Amino acid sequence: VSRLNDLIRQVGRKDEVLASDLQREVAALADRRSFGLNFERHVPEAVELPGRPVRRGDKVRILPPRGQARTAADERLWRVTRTSAGEAEVEVAPLDDDSDDARTTVTREDLVVVAEFRDPIYPGLVSTGTVERGGDKPFHTVINAENYHALQALLFTHRGKVDAIYIDPPYNSGARDWKYNNDYVEGDDLYRHSKWLAMMERRLLLAKELLNPDDSVLIVTIDEKEYLRLGLLLEQVLPDAKIQMISTVINPTGAVRGSSFARSDEYIFIASYGVTGAPRVSRSWSKDGHATSSAAPAEPYWRNLRRSGSNSLRSDRPNLYYALRVDPSTGRVSTDGPGDEVLPIRPDGKDGYWQVSAAALPSLLGAGFVRSRRHRGEWIIQYLATGEQAKVAAGDFVEEGREENGALVLRGVTADLTVATTQWATPSHSARHHGAVLLKALIGDRSFPFPKSLYAVEDVLRFFVADKPEATILDFFAGSGTTAHAAMRLNRQDGGRRRSISVTNNEVSADEQRTLRDGGYRPDDPDWEALGICEYVTKPRITAAITGRTPKGDLVTGDYKFTDEFQMADGLEENVEFFTLTYEAPLQVASHRAFERIAPLLWLRAGARGGRIDDVSDGWDVAETYGVLADLDGAGPFVEAVAGAPGLQLAFIVTDEDRLFEAVVRELPDHVEPVRLYESYLRTFELSTGGSTR
C-alpha cells in the first residue's frame, strides 16, 4: 500500500482529481476486513435530480433526444463550466477531460443534474399539500426525495430523536425492482449483492445517527435473497444493538417457484437499543390476529363519543345532535343536569353528532361506560363501545371502582398474555388480504407491487411504541405509506400523538418509463411525475386513510379488522403534510435568501406541530414550539415573546457573530435550546458527507 501511495502522490502532481479518486479506492481496499462481510463498498453511487436548476459547477448528464432510449454514452458525466441567467444554453465539459476542445454547448432542458453521494448537498423542503383532521396533533410528514439525501436532511432535524425506524428495502430479486446509479440492477449482474450492500450500508449509517441511542429500535423486513448478508451488515453497522430475527408468514398458501419449496414467509430483523421487558401478545394472537403486543396489561379503548370521519356532520344524523352537561367540580356527564354545556363540535368548527342517542345515553352513564376528560380547556366525552362493553362482561377487564365522574375504573387482565416467539403465523399478516386488497379499497386500481399487511406493520411497531404515545417513527423506504397508516391506527387505539416521517422517491415503474419515454416524455414532465410512486400511490393512500375517501371522492368501502374494528370510511383524526426535497445553493442559504425552503426543516426540528414560521421579513417571529430571530435589532421583543410562550422549545438565531449569538442566548429561558443559523445547518451537511459515501 505504501508503494501505491507514492505512485498516487506522483499522479497528484498532474491531476489532483484523479489522484483523489485513486486514493479513495485504495483506502477502501485497505479497509477490508480479514473476517466478516466484504463487498465493493467503494463503488460510487449517484442519483439524477430532475427539476433541479442547473448551476455553474454542477455535475450533469446530457439527455438523449425525446423519444429515444438512453445508451451507455448518455451515462457520461459532465461539469457545467459556464452559464448565465436567462440564457437557454450552457457550456459543459466532460468530467474526465477539461480541455477546451472537449467543451460543448447544450440547452438547459437537455441536461439533468447528477449528485454523487460523496458530494455535500444543502436540502430544503417545499410543501405540496396538507390534510388536516387532527386538531392540535403533530403532523405526519411525507417527503418525496432520494432517501439518502432525505436522511441527511433529517440529521439536522432529528439526530438522536427517532424512537423507531421501520423499513422494507428492495429485496434485490433481480426483477428490476431497484436502481443503482440510475440503472436497474438485473438478476445476472455479478455485482448486484455488492451494490445492494453498498446502498444499504450508506443509509443504515445515517439511520444509526437518527436513532435515540438510549431507547429505540430499527426494524428491517427482507426475504431469503439477502437476509444472510443483511444480518452480517447489521452486526457490523450496529455493533452495540441487540439483534434478533423473526420469521413471519405473509402468504399462507405459499408462492410456488419452480422445483423449490413454496415460499410462505419472510424475515424481520429487529435491532434494539435499551429496550427492556419481553414483548408479549395474547395466547390467541396467532389464531385471531387480535394483538395485545405490550408487556403491560391491555387497557380498554375509550372512544370519542362524537362521531368522526365521513358522514359525521349534524345534517347526516340530526337526531343525534343534542347538548350534554358536565359538572365542572366532578366531571359527571348528564343530559339535563347542572354544569358546562358540551355540544358535538368537530375540529373544523362544524356541527357533528354523538354516536349514542339521548334516550340510550342514561343507561350507559349508569353502567359507568361514559366518562369526561379535560383537554386544553375543553371537555371531551368518551365512551366504551359495544365491543369493549362485551370485554367487561367477559372479564377481560376487571372493575376496580369508579371515578368521581361515575365512569368505571378498569384494569386489564394479563393472564392470557405470553412472550411473543420468533415464529409468527397470524391471519392478520397476510400480505394479499390485508396489503393488496386493503390498498385497492383505498386508492382503487392504482397498482403497487407487494404492499405490506397494515396489521403486520402495526403489530411489530406496537411492541416498541405502545408505551410511547408521542413516538417519532421513520420509514425511509416508505413505498405505499403503510408505516404512516399503521402509526395513525396506533394513535386511534390509545389516543396517542405519534408522528411518522415517510420518505419515498417518485420513481415510475420500468414498464411505465418505457411507455412514457416512447411518447416523448422525460422525468420532471408533469405527465411523467403524475405516475410516480409518491404522487400516484403514497400521497393518495395516506390521504384516503385520513379522510375516508378515495382519490375519486367516493367513500372507502370495507372495515378495519382485528385490534380496532371500524369502518374505513370513518377516516382517522390525523394531520399530514407532503413535501418535496429541494437542493439549495449554500451561498443563498448563508445569505438568508433560501429561508422559505429551510423553514419546514426548522418546524420539523421543533416537533412538526402548531404553526410554521415561513416568513421573517419583520425580523423575528414566534410560533407555538419555536421562534426565529433573523434581525438582532429585534432581540429584545423576541426574547420577551419566547419567555411568554410556555410550549416553546427552540430558538433559531440568524447571525455570523459568535459574540452576538452568545448575547442573545444569555437572555433566553433555560429550557429553550438555541440553534445558530446558518452555521448549524451548513455544518450538518458538510460533516454528513464522508466515509459512508466513499
Residue locations for each model-derived region?
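Aromatic- and acidic-residue-enriched carbohydrate-binding clefts of CAZyme catalytic domains
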Residues: 175-191, 511
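Conserved proline-anchored active-site loop of SAM-dependent methyltransferases
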Residues: 160-179, 234, 473-487, 598
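Glycine-rich S-adenosyl-L-methionine
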Residues: 187-206
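Conserved SAM-binding loop and adjacent beta-strand
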Residues: 443-455
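Accessory, often C-terminal, charged low-complexity segments
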Residues: 1-134, 138-140, 155-159, 163, ...
